[in-house]
A protein has these predicted regions:
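Charge-dense, helix-prone N-terminal extensions
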Residues: 1-144
Length: 144
């Protein structure tokens, strides 16, 4: 796995680990599990820490030849947003949020819910293949 540089002398991977640990509840555990699945699906994934603003500490991002997905936590949900999710086949129907747009798709996970690891890794691999191909238009086959 590769890392991009980050701020305050910490690597992006260190910032991601720290932010997940600081959550201290099911959200951090869920994001840590999904992070592990991302790394299993693509050992060459690049972890980044982006969009740091005064009102936001930043967002964990996973990339490979372009953005794959972001991981965010809110009070009652963990959200994984795939930047080109509308172009990915999702036979397991993991995408359950941001379904109306032409580009992004997201997976919202609530406390107690589990994500099918095999199906999730398949989405990661598809996203990497799509980024590597240079294609950005949604395929008609991927829509459901």
């Amino acid at each position: 796995m590769k890392e991009s540089s980050a701020s305050q002398g910490q690597s992006a991977s260190e910032l991601i680990s720290k932010s997940f640990a600081e959550l201290g509840d099911w959200r951090g555990e869920t994001l840590s599990r999904l992070r592990m699945l991302i790394k299993e699906a693509d050992p060459e994934v690049v972890e980044e820490w982006k969009w740091v603003k005064p009102a936001s500490p930043g967002t964990p991002v996973w990339s490979h030849d372009g953005l794959i997905c972001t991981g965010e936590s809110y009070k009652s949900v963990v959200k994984l947003t795939f930047s080109k999710g509308a172009s990915l086949a999702d036979p397991a129907r993991l995408f359950n949020s941001s379904l109306d747009g032409n580009t992004r798709r997201a997976i919202d996970i609530h406390e107690g819910e589990e994500v099918d690891g095999s199906a999730f890794k398949a989405l990661i691999r598809q996203a990497v293949a799509l980024n590597s191909s240079g294609t950005s238009k949604p395929s008609k086959k991927a829509k459901s």
